[in-house]
Amino acid sequence: MKQKFSILLFLLLLWFTGSQAVAQNAPNPFDIEQPSLRVFLPAPELATGRAVVACPGGGYSHLAVDHEGYDWAPYFNKQGIALIVLKYRMPNGDRTLPISDAEAAMKIVRDSADVWNLNPRDIGIMGSSAGGHLASTIATHAKPELRPDFQILFYPVITMDKSYTHMGSHNSLLGKDASAELEKEYSNEKQVTKETPRAFIVYSDDDKAVPPANGVNYYLALNKNGVPAVLHIYPSGGHGWGIREGFLYKDEMLNELTSWLRSFKVPRKDAVRVACIGNSITYGARIKNRDRDSYPSVLSRM
């Protein structure tokens, strides 16, 4: 890998108090009590301005940071894409911890766009297994300024429905006695809107840990809402293969991902956003779902 920069940022994420994340001394690399970002930038001559924030899996109890995180850097950097790997905190009874870490990561990457030569309107999120649940949660729940522009999901946990979720992830995030309302809130196939970003979703048909029905239902919800999405289910491979050589369909998967990443246009980095100032019609008074369908809301997404 022609890696020009590898920057290790350690974050104090007091997200809900509005505190600014700052660099800290390096903790133990296996410490998941303190979140961190590791940034891999492509060579300047290859850089496209695109970036991906990676959320490794681990059932919300540990993190597979290598084959679902750092080991992806050569692939993305070769495509001219920056890779930012997030080591997020485990919930340990507080589901807001990993979610706030991922939201803060999106904010930091966008705020650092000029420094890292990124397009702030071309920042995606990637997640594997439970990290896929975290990534799809940010894609479906986050405020517009924190929402990714696209999502890449490998064998993701999508639902919290006990009939087909990954129970380890469910219990670590929500607890064994989670209410039906809470399970619905974090069943991301039920939270898709027209504003949810486009998605690339991959499973193996013989995945016994996370049933592919998680991704099928998410794809159907995206499709119903007019969100571009692709779903690939390979005949075998089980669960947790990441970018390991042992995955039989690795080459096909990478070719599909490369083609997908090249398939959609990106707003220019210097594109101007236009705001409307006007009467109640312009603002969207009496328009159902005005946060989504009013003129200012529509223009903000252009």
Tell me what each language-model feature is.
Residues T48-G57:
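Short beta-strand element of the alpha/beta-hydrolase
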Residues K208-N214:
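Conserved alpha/beta-hydrolase "acid-adjacent" motif
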Residues V266-M302:
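Serine-esterase "nucleophile elbow" of acetyl-processing enzymes
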Residues A64-A73, I84-P120, R244-E252:
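Catalytic nucleophile-loop/oxyanion-hole region of alpha/beta-hydrolase
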Residues A26-P29, P156-Q191, P197:
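Mobile cap/lid helix-loop segments that gate and shape the active-site cleft of serine hydrolases
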Residues A104-S169, E183:
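Primarily recognizes the serine-hydrolase "nucleophile elbow" in alpha/beta-hydrolase
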Residues E195, F200-Y203, D207:
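Short beta-strand/loop motif that positions the catalytic acidic residue
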Residues F40, V216-R268, T282:
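C-terminal catalytic histidine-bearing segment of alpha/beta-hydrolase fold enzymes
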